[in-house]
Amino acid sequence: MSWIERIKSNITPTRKASIPEGVWTKCDSCGQVLYRAELERNLEVCPKCDHHMRMTARNRLHSLLDEGSLVELGSELEPKDELKFRDSKKYKDRLASAQKETGEKDALVVMKGTLYGMPVVAAAFEFAFMGVSMGSVVGARFVRAVEQAQEDNCPLICFSASGGARMQEALMSLMQMAKTSAALAKMQERGLPYISVLTDPTMGGVSASFAMLGDLNIAEPKALIGFAGPRVIEQTVREKLPPRFQRSEFLIEKGAIDMIVRRPEMRLKLASILAKLMNLPAPNPEAPREGVVVPPVPDQEPEA
């Protein structure tokens, strides 16, 4: 037996560790390998470079509202292929694929609940649903959110993210720009606050309508915000655009938005702003996440 064979005979093979899929992920910006559970606890913000990754609509709403207070609105509304549209694929097949992938019926999720005990209505876009395009159901759900805020006499918060209008619905999609803007005008007449939170990316018809109509327009760091994308603009004007063009830091320098807030600080910041606008006590940062719903008590005559 050669010395190599003697060494090989003394080697005990070990079983390769089985790591479940999805335990680790990589930061899109710095490339750091991150533990998935830790990243979720950090609200999808990279602990190394502070890059804000995309967050599902439901996770965003659950991270915002008090535990146990969430009630979904407009879940019965579903998209329909009224035009029988077809490009390289039937629209109804695209819808079925997006619904299966995301578990959502459409790109906007609306819930009412409480934020530090204060009643609010909140909406958030699901990025993975057909590029967060705006169709008729998105418009209908947003209007439902506005109407619920008026009914409850409470603020509305919307986390926008969109690639624009949904071309498969043609004019019915474009009509949602006017429909949502008109609904917000009625809310403004009531004097109820509407805060728009712009996330990456917020483009097209959404940015040209309700995403930029907030009483306060807040953006997450480095979010891409605009109508047409930078590549399209460069090809049109045939000029090189300035650095960070259409990013939230560029927009705040030009006065296009009101403030930039990091995601981990968003919940308390929104609650503090709304408390001032609604003339309510400032939120307690140490308060538990449980929902505290305190309905107004109407003035009543004592029973005889």
Curated annotation (Swiss-Prot):
GO terms for cellular component: acetate CoA-transferase complex. Binds 1 zinc ion per subunit. Residues 23-292 form the CoA carboxyltransferase N-terminal domain. It comes from the Bacteria. Keywords: ATP-binding, Cytoplasm, Fatty acid biosynthesis, Fatty acid metabolism, Lipid biosynthesis, Lipid metabolism, Metal-binding, Nucleotide-binding, Transferase, Zinc, Zinc-finger. It holds the Pfam family Zn_ribbon_ACC. Residues 295-304 have a biased composition (Pro residues). Zn(2+) binds at C27, C30, C46, C49. Its EC number is 2.1.3.15. Pathway: Lipid metabolism; malonyl-CoA biosynthesis; malonyl-CoA from acetyl-CoA: step 1/1. One of its GO terms (biological process) is fatty acid biosynthetic process. HAMAP family: AcetylCoA_CT_beta. This is Acetyl-coenzyme A carboxylase carboxyl transferase subunit beta. It comes from Shigella flexneri serotype 5b (strain 8401).
